[in-house]
Amino acid sequence: LARLIDPEEFGVVAIATVIISFFSIFSDLGIAPAIIQNKHLTEDKLNDIFSFTLWTGIGISILFFLSSWPISLFYKQSSLLSICHLLSFNLFFASVNIVPNALLFKDKEFKFIAYRSLFVQCIGGIIAILAAISGAGLYALIINPIFSSILIFIISIRKKPQKLKYTFGSKSIHEIFSYSAYQFM
Protein backbone atom coordinates (compact mmCIF):
# COMPACT_ATOMS: atom_id res chain seq x y z
CA LEU A 1 0.00 0.00 0.00
CA ALA A 2 2.90 2.37 0.72
CA ARG A 3 3.86 2.38 -2.96
CA LEU A 4 0.32 2.98 -4.16
CA ILE A 5 -0.79 5.74 -1.78
CA ASP A 6 0.74 9.16 -1.12
CA PRO A 7 2.29 9.87 2.30
CA GLU A 8 -0.11 12.82 2.76
CA GLU A 9 -3.04 10.43 2.51
CA PHE A 10 -1.46 8.19 5.14
CA GLY A 11 -1.21 11.28 7.35
CA VAL A 12 -4.90 12.11 6.95
CA VAL A 13 -5.90 8.56 7.88
CA ALA A 14 -3.46 8.65 10.82
CA ILE A 15 -5.24 11.75 12.18
CA ALA A 16 -8.60 9.99 11.95
CA THR A 17 -7.15 6.85 13.53
CA VAL A 18 -5.83 8.73 16.56
CA ILE A 19 -9.18 10.44 17.09
CA ILE A 20 -11.21 7.25 16.65
CA SER A 21 -8.94 5.54 19.19
CA PHE A 22 -10.02 8.13 21.74
CA PHE A 23 -13.69 7.41 21.00
CA SER A 24 -13.04 3.64 21.16
CA ILE A 25 -11.94 3.94 24.77
CA PHE A 26 -15.43 5.13 25.66
CA SER A 27 -17.15 2.38 23.70
CA ASP A 28 -15.41 -0.42 25.63
CA LEU A 29 -15.61 0.99 29.17
CA GLY A 30 -13.76 -2.06 30.50
CA ILE A 31 -16.76 -4.30 29.82
CA ALA A 32 -14.82 -7.10 28.07
CA PRO A 33 -12.47 -7.84 30.99
CA ALA A 34 -15.44 -7.67 33.36
CA ILE A 35 -17.31 -10.30 31.32
CA ILE A 36 -14.24 -12.52 31.24
CA GLN A 37 -13.73 -12.29 35.02
CA ASN A 38 -17.36 -12.60 36.16
CA LYS A 39 -18.37 -16.22 36.64
CA HIS A 40 -22.00 -15.50 37.52
CA LEU A 41 -23.29 -13.89 34.32
CA THR A 42 -26.47 -15.53 33.07
CA GLU A 43 -27.58 -15.50 29.45
CA ASP A 44 -30.17 -12.85 30.32
CA LYS A 45 -27.53 -10.61 31.89
CA LEU A 46 -25.25 -11.07 28.89
CA ASN A 47 -28.12 -10.05 26.60
CA ASP A 48 -28.62 -6.94 28.76
CA ILE A 49 -24.93 -6.08 28.45
CA PHE A 50 -24.99 -6.78 24.70
CA SER A 51 -27.97 -4.44 24.30
CA PHE A 52 -26.16 -1.80 26.35
CA THR A 53 -23.05 -2.05 24.14
CA LEU A 54 -25.23 -1.82 21.04
CA TRP A 55 -26.93 1.37 22.24
CA THR A 56 -23.59 2.75 23.43
CA GLY A 57 -22.10 1.94 20.03
CA ILE A 58 -24.91 3.78 18.27
CA GLY A 59 -24.44 6.81 20.52
CA ILE A 60 -20.66 6.95 20.19
CA SER A 61 -20.83 6.39 16.43
CA ILE A 62 -23.30 9.26 16.06
CA LEU A 63 -21.12 11.45 18.27
CA PHE A 64 -18.04 10.65 16.17
CA PHE A 65 -20.02 11.18 12.97
CA LEU A 66 -21.14 14.63 14.17
CA SER A 67 -17.63 15.46 15.41
CA SER A 68 -16.24 14.94 11.93
CA TRP A 69 -17.19 18.47 10.85
CA PRO A 70 -15.22 20.24 13.60
CA ILE A 71 -12.35 17.75 13.15
CA SER A 72 -12.06 18.44 9.43
CA LEU A 73 -12.28 22.20 10.04
CA PHE A 74 -9.64 22.11 12.78
CA TYR A 75 -7.14 20.19 10.63
CA LYS A 76 -8.19 22.02 7.44
CA GLN A 77 -8.62 18.68 5.67
CA SER A 78 -11.91 18.26 3.86
CA SER A 79 -11.15 14.59 3.21
CA LEU A 80 -11.24 13.97 6.97
CA LEU A 81 -14.99 14.58 6.87
CA SER A 82 -15.77 11.54 4.72
CA ILE A 83 -13.07 9.43 6.38
CA CYS A 84 -14.57 10.07 9.83
CA HIS A 85 -18.08 9.43 8.53
CA LEU A 86 -17.04 6.04 7.19
CA LEU A 87 -14.99 5.13 10.26
CA SER A 88 -18.02 5.75 12.48
CA PHE A 89 -19.28 2.36 11.22
CA ASN A 90 -16.08 0.83 12.57
CA LEU A 91 -16.83 2.27 16.01
CA PHE A 92 -20.33 0.81 16.01
CA PHE A 93 -19.27 -2.71 15.02
CA ALA A 94 -16.33 -2.69 17.43
CA SER A 95 -18.74 -1.78 20.22
CA VAL A 96 -21.34 -4.46 19.46
CA ASN A 97 -18.58 -7.05 19.18
CA ILE A 98 -17.48 -6.53 22.80
CA VAL A 99 -19.75 -9.19 24.34
CA PRO A 100 -19.36 -11.97 21.72
CA ASN A 101 -15.59 -11.43 21.60
CA ALA A 102 -15.28 -11.42 25.41
CA LEU A 103 -17.22 -14.69 25.54
CA LEU A 104 -14.80 -16.23 23.06
CA PHE A 105 -11.90 -15.22 25.29
CA LYS A 106 -13.74 -16.38 28.41
CA ASP A 107 -14.30 -19.80 26.84
CA LYS A 108 -10.60 -19.89 25.84
CA GLU A 109 -11.34 -20.29 22.15
CA PHE A 110 -7.96 -18.84 21.22
CA LYS A 111 -7.50 -21.03 18.16
CA PHE A 112 -10.83 -19.85 16.75
CA ILE A 113 -9.94 -16.21 17.53
CA ALA A 114 -6.56 -16.59 15.79
CA TYR A 115 -8.05 -18.21 12.68
CA ARG A 116 -10.84 -15.65 12.58
CA SER A 117 -8.36 -12.78 12.78
CA LEU A 118 -6.04 -14.31 10.18
CA PHE A 119 -8.91 -14.93 7.76
CA VAL A 120 -10.41 -11.46 8.20
CA GLN A 121 -7.08 -9.63 7.93
CA CYS A 122 -6.04 -11.56 4.80
CA ILE A 123 -9.35 -10.86 3.06
CA GLY A 124 -9.35 -7.23 4.23
CA GLY A 125 -5.75 -6.76 3.11
CA ILE A 126 -6.48 -8.15 -0.34
CA ILE A 127 -9.51 -5.89 -0.70
CA ALA A 128 -7.47 -2.86 0.43
CA ILE A 129 -4.68 -3.61 -2.06
CA LEU A 130 -7.17 -4.10 -4.89
CA ALA A 131 -8.84 -0.82 -3.94
CA ALA A 132 -5.47 0.97 -3.93
CA ILE A 133 -4.58 -0.48 -7.33
CA SER A 134 -7.92 0.67 -8.72
CA GLY A 135 -7.20 4.22 -7.50
CA ALA A 136 -9.24 4.47 -4.30
CA GLY A 137 -6.47 6.52 -2.67
CA LEU A 138 -6.85 7.11 1.04
CA TYR A 139 -10.14 5.19 1.08
CA ALA A 140 -8.10 2.05 0.44
CA LEU A 141 -6.55 2.59 3.87
CA ILE A 142 -9.88 2.54 5.70
CA ILE A 143 -11.48 -0.33 3.80
CA ASN A 144 -9.61 -2.93 5.85
CA PRO A 145 -10.58 -1.65 9.33
CA ILE A 146 -14.22 -1.15 8.36
CA PHE A 147 -14.48 -4.49 6.57
CA SER A 148 -12.64 -6.24 9.40
CA SER A 149 -14.87 -4.89 12.16
CA ILE A 150 -18.02 -5.89 10.26
CA LEU A 151 -16.78 -9.37 9.36
CA ILE A 152 -15.37 -10.05 12.83
CA PHE A 153 -18.74 -9.10 14.31
CA ILE A 154 -20.63 -11.38 11.90
CA ILE A 155 -18.36 -14.33 12.65
CA SER A 156 -18.37 -13.71 16.41
CA ILE A 157 -22.13 -13.25 16.71
CA ARG A 158 -22.71 -16.49 14.80
CA LYS A 159 -20.37 -18.32 17.17
CA LYS A 160 -21.69 -16.64 20.36
CA PRO A 161 -25.22 -15.40 19.51
CA GLN A 162 -26.75 -12.66 21.64
CA LYS A 163 -30.30 -11.37 21.79
CA LEU A 164 -31.08 -7.70 21.45
CA LYS A 165 -33.32 -6.16 24.07
CA TYR A 166 -34.83 -2.75 23.49
CA THR A 167 -34.49 -2.08 27.19
CA PHE A 168 -31.75 -3.44 29.36
CA GLY A 169 -31.73 -4.23 33.04
CA SER A 170 -29.90 -1.61 35.02
CA LYS A 171 -29.07 -4.25 37.64
CA SER A 172 -27.03 -6.23 35.10
CA ILE A 173 -25.23 -3.11 33.92
CA HIS A 174 -24.55 -1.99 37.49
CA GLU A 175 -23.18 -5.43 38.35
CA ILE A 176 -20.74 -5.40 35.44
CA PHE A 177 -19.76 -1.76 36.01
CA SER A 178 -18.72 -2.51 39.57
CA TYR A 179 -15.75 -4.28 37.98
CA SER A 180 -15.41 -2.56 34.61
CA ALA A 181 -15.16 0.94 36.09
CA TYR A 182 -11.75 0.04 37.50
CA GLN A 183 -10.69 -1.42 34.15
CA PHE A 184 -11.81 1.73 32.38
CA MET A 185 -9.79 4.01 34.62
Predicted regions and their residues:
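Hydrophobic/aromatic residues in alpha-helical transmembrane segments
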Residues: 1, 28-32, 67, 100-101, ...
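Membrane-water interface segments that mark the loop-to-transmembrane alpha-helix transition
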Residues: 12, 16, 25-69, 82-88, ...
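Alpha-helical transmembrane segments of multi-pass membrane proteins
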Residues: 22-26, 62-66, 77-103, 114-122, ...
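Primarily residues marking transmembrane-helix entry/exit sites
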Residues: 10, 45-46, 80, 138, ...
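Interhelical loop/hinge segments that connect adjacent transmembrane helices in multipass membrane
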Residues: 111, 115, 154-185
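Membrane-interface junctions at transmembrane-helix termini in multi-pass inner-membrane proteins
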Residues: 34-43, 93-116, 139, 160, ...
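Membrane-interface helix-loop junctions in multi-pass transport and translocation proteins
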Residues: 2-17, 69-73, 81-85, 108-111, ...
